[in-house]
A protein has these predicted regions:
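N-terminal, positively charged/glycine-rich alpha-helical extensions of SAM-dependent methyltransferases
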Residues: 1-25
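Conserved alpha-helix/loop element of class I SAM-dependent methyltransferases that forms part
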Residues: 35-52
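Conserved class I S-adenosyl-L-methionine
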Residues: 54-60, 151-175
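Class I SAM-dependent methyltransferase SAM/SAH-binding core
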Residues: 65-111
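A short acidic, Gly/Pro-enriched loop at the edge of an enzyme's catalytic core
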Residues: 113-122
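A short glycine-rich, Lys/Arg-flanked "PGG" loop and its adjoining helix->strand segment in the class I
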Residues: 136-148
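Acceptor-substrate binding/catalytic loop of class I
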Residues: 176-193
């Protein structure tokens, strides 16, 4: 039975990713940007939290791009999502690629937090918060899922004019990097808002990095510029 908490999802957002599910592992598809940034975010997470031997949860795992990579770094990874088709793609890829120590479940972060509180060394929630009706609820669940002293990593889009121009006008309408309608500007989250969400539930900010894209070279890099895409590293207050 679906619980109230598991309804923190926009049906239209689920439909978007379900329609594109078969493209998740096509590096020339709409998911090409995720494949391009994956090594950067993976290395950043690993540099701060050391994945090897850790129990990791990837919230909003989609087709498993990050979950698969973290498992290959030596972590035992659970990917959680509510998009059935995307999860099937993730499971099939793990089987075909023989990825060790990775599994997937169709469950919300909120419901998993009730089932397995304080169970993970590391929780990641990447490129998801801007797609849900209640991001604070997701942040709260992530804080409940991680062990005291454990790490929670987020990535999302800042909310300002530059982010609107680059992430929506540029990426969706001019360059065609993403399908039109992928993002809604009103759902973008400023770093200060996300930091506030975290502090309310015992997550202390440890690091923040911007993610820059050069449309000419089609390359990405981490930087101090957080005006568009950014990654936030937090730690759960130890008891």
């Amino acid at each position: 039975m679906q619980t109230l908490k598991s309804r923190n999802v926009d049906p239209a957002e689920l439909a978007k990713f379900s329609d594109l599910a078969h493209h998740w592992w096509d590096k020339t598809s709409e998911f090409a940007p995720l494949h391009a940034i994956n090594p950067l975010r993976l290395d950043w997470i690993n540099s701060l939290a050391s994945l090897s031997g850790k129990r990791v949860l990837d919230v909003g795992c989609g087709g498993g791009i990050l979950a698969d990579a973290m498992a290959r770094k030596g972590a035992t990874v659970l990917g959680a999502d509510l998009a059935t088709k995307s999860l099937k793609v993730a499971q099939l890829h793990a089987l075909e690629a023989q990825t060790p120590n990775v599994s997937y479940r169709e469950i919300s972060a909120e419901d998993l937090a009730l089932e397995q509180p304080a169970s993970f060394d590391i929780v990641t929630c990447m490129e998801m918060l801007e797609h849900v009706p209640d991001p604070q609820s997701i942040v709260t669940a992530c804080a409940a899922l991680v062990k005291p002293g454990g790490w929670v990593f987020f990535s999302t889009l800042n909310r300002n004019g530059r982010a609107f121009l680059q992430a929506i006008v540029g990426a969706e309408y001019v360059l065609g990097m993403l399908p039109r309608g992928t993002h809604e500007y009103a759902k973008f989250i400023t770093p200060s808002e996300l930091a506030t969400f975290g502090r309310k539930v015992g997550l202390e900010i440890q690091a923040i990095r911007g993610l820059e894209h050069n449309p000419l070279t089609k390359r990405y890099k981490l930087s101090s510029d957080t005006r568009v895409n950014y990654l936030l590293a937090t730690q759960k207050t130890a008891i």
